[in-house]
C-alpha cells in the first residue's frame, strides 16, 4: 500500500472514531508530521508511513519526540494503526498525556 493511500484510510478512520475532529494535512517540509488532529481541547501529530520499515526523513524523529512530550505524537503505519488509534483515543479522553512508543 502506498503512503498516500494509507493516509487516506487513516483520515477516514480518525473522522469516524473522533466525530467533529479537525484533521489537517501538513506540508511535507522540514520533516513536519503529515497530520494534525484537533479534538475538543486536545491535539495530536501523526506521521504516516507505508510500512514499519519505511525510512524517516531528517527531523521527523525530532518533531515526533518533541510533540509527544507536549501532547500526543506518533509514527503510524498499517502494522500499528490499531494500537496508535487506541492510544490516541485514550489520550483524548484523559486529562493527562498518554504516550505511545514510536518504535514498536
Give the positions of each predicted feature.
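Catalytic phosphate/metal-binding cores of nucleic-acid and nucleotide-processing enzymes, i.e., regions
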Residues: 1-104
Amino acid at each position: 500500500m502506498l503512503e498516500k493511500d494509507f493516509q487516506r484510510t487513516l483520515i477516514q478512520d480518525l473522522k469516524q472514531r473522533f466525530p467533529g475532529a479537525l484533521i489537517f494535512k501538513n506540508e511535507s517540509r522540514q520533516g513536519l508530521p503529515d497530520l494534525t488532529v484537533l479534538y475538543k481541547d486536545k491535539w495530536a501529530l501523526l506521521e504516516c508511513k507505508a510500512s514499519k520499515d519505511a525510512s524517516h526523513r531528517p527531523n521527523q524523529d525530532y518533531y515526533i519526540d518533541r510533540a509527544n512530550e507536549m501532547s500526543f505524537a506518533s509514527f503510524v503505519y498499517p502494522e500499528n494503526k490499531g494500537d496508535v488509534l487506541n492510544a490516541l483515543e485514550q489520550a483524548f479522553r484523559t486529562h493527562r498525556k498518554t504516550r505511545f512508543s514510536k518504535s514498536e
